[in-house]
């Protein structure tokens, strides 16, 4: 059977990028050796969701350690990989890998080109005479989150808080790395994730999924644009969250081109989620609409 991305259902493998170990070459988990063709092709192809591809040299040591070498440095540079990026590899059974990059619990999105606007001296003087807070307020307005108008008006306050959580989610993740305790937590999480095959946790290995972490806001679950694009996801006003305790119906909202699911914190509480735990979200659709998300918690 072929998945929606065009690849047969070989299990994915996950690598946590470490600039000290993975900048020049990438060692592939030994447990994955069983899936490679024999003899091993000289080159492999890495593809990203935007359609770009990189040719890399496939090497095999005397200790039967398989790695990606020549060409890997360019892949690292072109994608701007940094420490603790999650690299999720989907193999086609021949010589190609579809690579998805996650950062701070969200898929890494393409960098938009910078637009430069020329401003005349007159405009500078005009802005200088105006309210010094005007520009700051404009930036805030551009980054405001627009939620779906669902439910009664007495729920608006909660949703506003959730929207704020969405906006600061990435910053919270970055800030959590400032302490020694935070670095140790991430190290434990990275070590535990290095050997994870996400499909073994899924109810149906053919279902699409995405990976979240417990380091983001506990009030909302964010589904990034790239996940929505990769799997062609469509949502109604609500979705069912399923775990080992049962099912919760939650409201769905929109933030720009992302989707957020509100009141996510109850899943954390009843599953006793701790900092550094990894969350695999399995998407279940009915008639091309996401009806449920089955949540699998991988303890650190």
Curated annotation (Swiss-Prot):
It is found in: Nucleus. One of its GO terms (cellular component) is nucleus. Residues 11-105 bind DNA. Residues 115-142 are annotated as: Disordered. InterPro entries: B3_DNA-bd, DNA-bd_pseudobarrel_sf, Plant_B3_domain. SUPFAM superfamilies: DNA-binding pseudobarrel domain. The keyword Transcription applies. It comes from the Eukaryota. The keyword Transcription applies. One of its GO terms (molecular function) is DNA binding. Residues 119-129 have a biased composition (Acidic residues). It holds the Pfam family B3. Keywords: DNA-binding, Nucleus, Transcription, Transcription regulation. Its main location: nucleus. This is B3 domain-containing protein At5g57720. It comes from Arabidopsis thaliana (Mouse-ear cress).
